[in-house]
Structure formats: C-alpha cells, structure tokens
Swiss-Prot record:
Binding site for S-adenosyl-L-methionine: H27, L29, G54, E75, D100, N120
Protein name in UniProt: Ribosomal RNA small subunit methyltransferase A
Keyword RNA-binding: yes
Key words, A-Z: Cytoplasm, Methyltransferase, RNA-binding, rRNA processing, S-adenosyl-L-methionine, Transferase
Annotated organism of origin: Phenylobacterium zucineum (strain HLK1)
Functional description taken from the UniProt entry: Specifically dimethylates two adjacent adenosines (A1518 and A1519) in the loop of a conserved hairpin near the 3'-end of 16S rRNA in the 30S particle. May play a critical role in biogenesis of 30S subunits.
Catalytic activity entry: adenosine(1518)/adenosine(1519) in 16S rRNA + 4 S-adenosyl-L-methionine = N(6)-dimethyladenosine(1518)/N(6)-dimethyladenosine(1519) in 16S rRNA + 4 S-adenosyl-L-homocysteine + 4 H(+)
CDD domains given in the database record: AdoMet_MTases
Gene behind this protein: rsmA
Family per record: Belongs to the class I-like SAM-binding methyltransferase superfamily. rRNA adenine N(6)-methyltransferase family. RsmA subfamily.
Organism taxonomic ancestry: Bacteria, Pseudomonadati, Pseudomonadota, Alphaproteobacteria, Caulobacterales
Compartments, as annotated in UniProt: Cytoplasm
E.C. number: 2.1.1.182
Enzyme class: transferase
Length: 285
C-alpha cells in the first residue's frame, strides 16, 4: 500500500469507529487541500525532519509525507494507533510516538537533528506547548502551528492592540512570528465554535538566555497581571520606579503599550538588581 492508495480520511475514521474527543480538544482537519497548503507554508521538503503533535486521523501527516519530509508524529490518544499504523505502513519515513507532547523530549525524538514543528494543535494544549518550545532547552528549526484565532492573534499582536499581552512578548522575544493563514470553523470535523489560524514562527538566532527568559516571564507576569495600571504600580514588588527608569521606560506607561524590547530591558534591569551586592546599612554611633 502507498499513500495514494490509502482510504480517504473519512473512510479511515469510519472503518476504525473513531470520533473527536472533546476532552482532548480534538477537531479533525479532513480537507487535504488545506493540509497541503499548511505543508507548503511550513517550507519543508525532502529529508527534512518534522515533528507533528496531535496527528489524529493523519490528514496533515499525509500532506507532510508527500513533501518527502521525515515525520515524527506524537499522539496522546491511543485510539488512533491502528489507523496511524496503516499510514506508517504506507510511508516508511513516518515514525509514530504515543505519549504526551508536554513531556516529550524533542531533542531525543529528532536524534539531535534540526527539526521543524508543524501541527494542528489540540486547542487545550496549544499555548503551553508553544511556551515550552520557545523557552525550553531545545530550539526548533521553525514552527508552523494552527491555533484558535484568538490565540494566534495574541501571539502576533503589536503593542497597543487589544490582543497584545504576555504571550506576544514571549513569542516575539524568542522568534519572528507572523500569521500566514486563516482556517474557517467549517473546515473541521466537528466544527469548533471558533475560527482558527496558522502562525509561522522562526526562532531568533540570538535567543535570550534561560536566565533572561526567566526574568522576562517574571516581569511580564507582573506587568500584565495588572495591565491597566501604570508600570510604577504593577511592578512595585519587583523594584518599582528605580527598576523602570533603569530600563529606560516611563513609570507612567501601561504594559499594553510597552514594546518587546522594553520588556527585555526590564528583564535585564531586574537581573542586574538581583545580582548587585546589597549595600550595608550605616552603623549607628
């Protein structure tokens, strides 16, 4: 059997008695025209290593295999093992891994080779997976990922936009992020109640150090935890006005208008304050 002679996705689902599980945030993308477009947007080809999370019935998997890429598909739902094994039998360059992507070791999966992440992510784990990939020790070659439209907007938002927040800062501090494709709800089975979008992220060559990323997460959590307040109030516990002025920012500004570079400067200022030796208090006479 080859990819061309496999049953259609709907036929495969029916043959195995499979359906989407709400608990796993599953919505199946069965239109091969759309999955092939996503594979093109991923810019992968012959011999490239691709990690796909949540392949489900394998629609995007098939499209990626058609490019000649070597696909490592990570699936949590054991129900799909027989169906995906049929795809693997037809495509020797597909490797199946059953387990939780949140705890997966991508460096081990890819055997140390550069790997691209291409996935129609389950809605309920998309954001934590993205944070893991952008801030963890392993750096992907690129990420082409589908999210709920609202999450995609939060990843790519600019300062001053309603969707701009902590996720945008972390994503854009570590990667060049841009929306590349909208996908209507009707394209999925079952149709979700929201629209979806594909985001393309290319990790920056000079990614912030782990210490700088930890500091960035700390200052963004404080700043956006009270996003309507001035920085002098929201960052009071981290150093207040001295911290903010050390970063070259206006203490009266609000988090929603501070650019990514400003938050990186805040992270640097917080690290500098933390590492500075404490000044001894003068002794009384």
């Amino acid at each position: 059997m080859s990819l061309e002679t496999l049953p259609t996705l709907r036929e495969a689902l029916e043959a195995h008695g499979l359906w989407a599980k709400k608990a796993f945030g599953q919505h199946f993308l069965l239109d091969l025209n759309i999955t092939r477009k996503i594979a093109r947007l991923a810019q992968v080809g012959d011999g490239d290593v691709v990690i796909e999370v949540g392949p489900g019935p394998g629609g995007l998997t098939r499209a990626l295999l058609e490019t000649g890429a070597r696909v490592i598909a990570v699936e949590k739902d054991e129900r799909f093992r027989p169906l995906l094994q049929e795809v693997a039998d037809a495509a020797p360059h597909l490797t199946l891994v059953f387990g939780d992507a949140l705890t997966a070791d991508e460096a081990a999966l890819s055997a140390g080779r550069p790997a691209h992440l291409v996935s129609n992510l389950p809605y309920n784990v998309g954001t934590p997976l993205l944070i893991k990939w952008l801030t963890g020790p392993w750096t992907p070659a690129s990420l082409t990922l589908m999210f709920q439209k609202e999450v995609a907007d939060r990843i790519t938002a600019a300062p001053g936009e309603d969707a701009y927040g902590r996720l945008a800062v972390i994503a854009q501090a570590t990667a060049d992020a841009r929306p590349v494709m909208d996908v209507p709800a009707r394209a999925f089975t079952p149709p979700p109640k929201v629209e979806s979008a594909v985001v393309r992220l290319e990790p920056r060559a000079a990614r912030p150090s782990p210490e700088r990323l930890d500091a960035l997460q700390k200052v963004t959590a404080a700043a956006f935890g009270q996003r309507r307040k001035m920085l002098r109030s929201s960052l009071k516990a981290l150093g207040g006005e001295p911290l903010i002025t050390a970063a070259g920012l206006d203490p009266a500004a609000r988090a929603e208008v501070v650019p990514v570079a400003g938050f990186l400067a805040l992270a640097d200022a917080w690290l500098a304050r933390r590492e500075a030796p404490a000044t001894a208090a003068p002794r009384g006479r």
